[in-house]
Amino acid sequence: MIQKGFTLIELLVVVAIIGILAAVGVVAYSGYTASAKRNATLAQHEKAVKFIQNNLGLCDVQGGGTLKLSSTRSFNCDMAANKGNIKNLNNILIGHFLDLGWKNPYGETDPVIYAGTNSSQDRDGRMRIDETECPGGYSNGARIALWIKTHKEYYPVLIEKDGWCKN
């Protein structure tokens, strides 16, 4: 009598192969999602930096006055480069980016951008905007630091308007 079906060994081999494929797939998917979160975070940071730089440049082109960022947000281009004025600008910029509905790619519930002077609240996917002193050799002035944190990077991009850091 001929029996049809699979032997126990054949079934174990198939289960082992499926297990190996699943393990490889999970590792690959995990790396893919981490890379996607990092790239989305860096893209948002780059957009924020370009937006700030372009709008500060527009201030110079229009020769001062008020620059409208959106229907609800604007700032005075004629501000002096001191920490108080830059802090106010930072708050306007934060409001603008939050109005756009930006989310943290890492899934954190905290806002994607916030104002702060230290790294205690920095988490993956968040941007911190603060005002920082001009480099040595400049007697006065301040500039904007837009920090970014991912699972691999942690650094600021320093942004300043022409004339902010001067002797």
Feature map (PLM): residue ranges:
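N-terminal single-pass transmembrane signal-anchor helix
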Residues: 2-33
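Generic N-terminal initiation segments characterized by hydrophobic and/or small/turn-forming residues
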Residues: 5-9, 18, 48, 86, ...
